[in-house]
Amino acid sequence: LTYLNHRRHPPASSALLMEAHKIIVKFFVEDASRIRGEQFVAIFHSWIQQQAIPEHLLIDVVDYQHLSGGPGTVLVAHEANFSMDREEGRLGLMYVRKQPANGDFGDRLRQGFRACLQGCARLEADTQLRFKTNDCVVRLNDRLLAPNNPETYAAVEPHLRTVVDKLYPNSD
């Protein structure tokens, strides 16, 4: 057995944070009543057949809708997972990067937004869903490189601001 030290870990350095690649981006659906959850399985299978998301090797679909608060329907790719989940009671498309991506942290953040928005656009084309692009969640899923603390936020915020400013020019 290994002793677990529960003391507060020191904040990650900005240099380490900039190596983080496990980026999560989620955009929410405007009206979840426009689709039944079980429809995502067939939709995601068609994406696999067409390899519909650029720069992603789409592999499998897993349906976890029977789990309350679970990940919903998951499209597994080598590089990342896409899932239609109802986290916090809100249906949305979540992109969870698993593999490192090229470029600096800002490039990886842009890549996460781009991949998630490509998935949203594809779902809008394949269904009656519409996504709210003015409301999203961004997370870094790496407790070592990006602990959830004010220092991490301060290091990430300028990169996130750059991405958001390019996506939404002339907005505050």
What are the functions of these language-model segments?
Residues 3-6, 13-45:
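Short, extreme N-terminal leader segments that mark the start of a protein/domain
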Residues 20-25, 131-150:
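Short glycine-rich, basic-tinged beta-strand/loop micro-motifs
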Residues 53-67, 122-141, 168-172:
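Short glycine-rich, low-complexity/disordered patches
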